Amino acid sequence: MAEEFLNTHNASILLSAANKSHYPQDDLPEVALAGRSNVGKSSFINTLLGRKNLARTSSKPGKTQLLNFYNIDDKLRFVDVPGYGYAKVSKTERAKWGKMIEEYLVTRDNLRVVVSLVDFRHDPSADDIQIYEFLKYYEIPVIIVATKADKIPRGKWNKHESSIKKKLNFDKKDHFIVFSSVDRTGLDESWDTILSEL
């Protein structure tokens, strides 16, 4: 349980950054959270930290346009990466986000693992596959978290998991976690897996 190692409720947003000159300058380990717009990233953060509105959930996808750094008990940081795959964002804007995300993922020494969130209800998008391949190429540790599990009958979970893994060309050495912010499925497993990567 995470509570043995850190007070997960002692969390706050630290800063938002557009480039590396704005990143926190210390050696705290960081966990990046990446995923499509409206995949449930904010809900995932809020559920893990036992807070309702620390990470703002948005009905307007693509609202997170900066890297948002969250301080957790002065021992760990979550880094909320801008949601990708939002159609109404211009190509220029998407390219800018892509460059910002890439710079962080490839150059940040503090980064320990990326939690890549996918929607459990659907096959991974081209963007989901691309970011997974990117992380594998650069040998960045990755945890796949399949969100919104409460929307699928438990009897169909294996089928959905197999389909997602096949489309991603999933590496068996990586972790795959089924998660729901509604009934907290996967909460302890998420924390245990994240902490094992630090």
Swiss-Prot record:
GO terms (BP aspect): division septum assembly
Positions annotated to bind GTP: 35-42, 62-66, 80-83, 147-150, 179-181
Cofactor entry: Mg(2+)
Claim: Metal-binding is one of the keywords in the record: yes
Keyword Kinase: no
Pfam families: MMR_HSR1
Molecular function terms from GO: GTP binding; metal ion binding
Family matches, as Gene3D superfamilies: P-loop containing nucleotide triphosphate hydrolases
Binding site for Mg(2+): 42, 64
An example Gene Ontology CC term for this record: cytosol
Entry superkingdom: Bacteria
CDD domains: YihA_EngB
UniProt keywords, alphabetically: Cell cycle, Cell division, GTP-binding, Magnesium, Metal-binding, Nucleotide-binding, Septation
Family: Belongs to the TRAFAC class TrmE-Era-EngA-EngB-Septin-like GTPase superfamily. EngB GTPase family.
Name of this protein: Probable GTP-binding protein EngB
Gene: engB
